[in-house]
């Protein structure tokens, strides 16, 4: 797994717990010319699309999508928050790390780190607040245990 460089330059270690490692999904991207705006770097809206793509890929890979559909539900975005730390440019390769940070009754926070491949620098951090809703009515509904179990939570002390 690609891990960002630590802030103080120390060696990063990672737990060997299989569930934890499976909870952090990696989504690889190569920045294209169409991702770049007039300022010459990746446009802020592109990060949101990458967040959506990474979350969907993780939900599909973990079985969350299938399990949610089986109970007649889906996920919708409530809010996004992004902190931009360093720009990305056409040709850059970036790994989006994403994981569930918590589950509440009808909501879940998913976190993201954007790590530039060539130097391991975290170029952005983000969060999405997702709401679990009934697919027919669009109304929030409680997240059942079988859905929660598809995506084990990564606690703050174990985040990359």
Question: At which residue positions do the language-model features occur?
Answer:
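Terminal targeting signals and extreme-terminal segments of soluble enzymes
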Residues: 2-95, 101-160
